[in-house]
Amino acid sequence: MATVNHASTRGQRRGTIRTRPHERILASYPNCHVRVLFLPTQRALESRGGTCTVSSQRLVFTSNQASEELDTLSVPLETMSVGKYMLPIFCAPYWQATMTHFTDGTSDHGQVIVRFPSGGGMSFQQTIRTAQAQWDIERHHEDILRTYQGSNVSSVR
């Protein structure tokens, strides 16, 4: 589930995240602007400066300023669409994706938009696509190789 302004990430040194078991940090992108749009209510949260970190399990944003309305965002890769990278003519490039299942209970889907005023957007797009593809492969292997639970069935003679 996607989490916004979660207590477990507040109070940490800005730009750092606590990794989960078996989670690897793939890349960090400073000076990002992030906007989260909750659908269908059209409620939006925004931060104009922070670090986006792509890990093997999720996308994490931490704001540079604690006073921002969007302090932290954590989105598991499996709840996010592939996304698209846009290069508008008159503003900073951005990446946009649809995400599902927020923990706050107010919405079951929304959009995340990450702007890159200082560059790095193409690298971000490649990193997150690679992470999502790897997550899909690992998940597929887990589904195929389920653990054997044994049964209480006796043999028939």
Where are these regions (language model features)?
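Anionic N-terminal interaction surfaces
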Residues: M1-V54, S118
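Acidic, Ser/Thr- and proline-rich intrinsically disordered linker/docking segments
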Residues: M1-T16, E69, V75-R157
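Conserved beta-hairpin
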Residues: R43-E69, L73
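Short regulatory "switch" loops immediately downstream of catalytic or recognition motifs
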Residues: V36-L37, S63, M99-F102
